[in-house]
Structures are given as C-alpha cells and as structure tokens.
Amino acid sequence: IIFIISKKKQMIKDYFYNDKFYLKIIKKKKDPRIIKEYKKILKYKKMIKFVYQNKPLGTGHAVLKTQKYIKDKYFLMLLPDDLIIKNNCSKSMIKIHKRYKSSVMASMNVKKKNVSRWGIYKLEKKIDKNNFFINAVIEKPSIKQTPSNKAVIGRYILPKEIFSILQKQKPGIGGEIHITDAIQSLIKKNKKFIAHNFK
C-alpha cells in the first residue's frame, strides 16, 4: 500500500506511526474499540509506504513517484478526491480485470455541462450493462469536444508499463501530467481498457 502525500499532509502518516499517542490514549481510556483500532493500524503499518509529491504537477507525476515500489504487472490506484462509501467498486473492478486480463477504470455518467471537470471516455464495445471496452479518454474536454458524458472516476487498475509512458509525457492542460493522457497513449498502442460503471 503506497500513500502519495505532500509534506503538508503529515497527519496521514502520523495516523499510522504516532505510537506514543495511541498508547497514551489506550492507557487512559482502556476502551476495547481503541485497542482494536490500534491493532488494525499495527497490522497495516508493515504494508505501507509513503512517497511525497510536494508540487501539484498532476496525477501522472504523482504515480511516477511510486515506480520503484510497483513490482506486479498491474496495480490498483485510488484517488481520495472521489469518495466511494457504499459499494466497494475496487472489488468488482478486480473481478473484471481477472476475467478480461485488461486495465479497468471506474466510471459514472455526468451531466454534459460538467464534462470539462472530468476525464471522459469514448465507448468502443459494450460487454454488459456495466462494462464497456473504450477507445479514447480525453482529459477535461469542452462540451463541443466531448465524446460522451461518461466520466472516469478515481479508481484505476493500470499496467506497470504506464510508467515508461509517463517518463516521456509532456505536461497537458494546466501544465500538469495527467494520468488520462498516459492511458490514451496506451489505448493507441492497442492496450485494452474497460470502463466499469457503478452506482
């Protein structure tokens, strides 16, 4: 598990590493719920690494910071901007990935007037009512340019080879390196991507 944070967000790291704070509370409160939570933290702490992105240079730039830690052929990326509370769409995305041996992105329908706030995908082929092969992703298009109202949400299963694309990628809109631009480059190389709609 890799967290990408800035130096200003040390509180996230402290949540896992501030042992003195937890032990002090446990001693004072003697609440079994706190003890249970602390044991959970100890378990996950061994699996967690932190990398820093101190300048907001885009999601692609942030992902590039994790390269040395990614060993598997594919990895799951979650953006904290998009909170998905009720349904664990990561679980269903992993099922789709295993079935089709493909990269997968979580998606939802957005109002056409709001497309410029999202990465938007173009459908190539319907798999079933919730899953589609895609043949294009455009980062924050105008209403005139948009291929659809299907937005890419912040959950991705991506291939390790995306790092070689990101290393050469030039900044896009807003001077940032966008992960969707790298995805589009992979699609052009005939790499399979599936959009997974969820509610």
Language model segments and positions:
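Short beta-strand/loop segment that forms part of the nucleotide-sugar
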Residues: 1-7
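Conserved beta-loop-beta/alpha segment of the NTase-like Rossmann-fold superfamily
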Residues: 11-14, 22-25, 34-124, 167-169
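Catalytic-core segments of class I nucleotidyltransferases/pyrophosphorylases
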Residues: 76, 90, 94, 98, ...
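Glycine-rich beta-alpha junction loops
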Residues: 8-9, 82-84, 110-112, 141, ...
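Small/polar loops that bind or transfer phosphate-bearing groups
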Residues: 4, 51-54, 154
